[in-house]
Amino acid sequence: MTASSGPGIALKGEAIGLAVIAELPLVIVNVQRGGPSTGLPTKTEQSDLFQALYGRNGEAPVPVIAAQTPGDCFYAAFEACEVAIKYRTPVFLLSDGYLANGSEPWSIPIFDDLPNIDPNFAVQNDDVAFMPYQRDKKTLARPWAIPGTSGLEHRIGGCLLYTSPSPRDS
């Protein structure tokens, strides 16, 4: 999870695009503020929707969720985490200065009553080869292989190379 406002999100555009192609579940909170460029940090505005939808190079779509009240911020963030993990994608959570600085009474949820978020980690099975490119038919997400787990490498016909080839070799 990371948070910023419009100018900071603009600087993170390439990394967000990389997270899309790498299928990394993460939540990006954008607390919107007014104006172009560095803008007006003390003026609130809801002007970053297009940035959230299209602010990356190429086709890198991401889900966008917006909180509607200060009390809704927790549930919107929880929903963003659910979507990010279930579908292996970055998710934008939009807020603004009014929500960031506002308050309202709300009941703190009982955490045992919240739905469980299952990351669907890949497990090594000696009987079946790990197929990282196979996807869940319902969500189209891949199992989440924990980096470094033996036998869960994403390798189809590749080979390990511990020395870089020299241009003279070609």
PLM regions with names:
Residues Y54-P61, C159-L160:
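Short acidic (Asp/Glu) and glycine-rich catalytic loops that position anionic groups and cofactors
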Residues A76-S164, R168-S170:
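Flexible, low-complexity linker and terminal segments
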Residues E14, Y54-N57, S103-E104, F111:
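Short capping/connector residues at structural and topological boundaries
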Residues G35-T38, E45-N57, P115, P119, ...:
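Ligand-binding clefts of soluble mixed alpha/beta catalytic domains
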Residues M1-L53, P63-A84:
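Thiamine diphosphate
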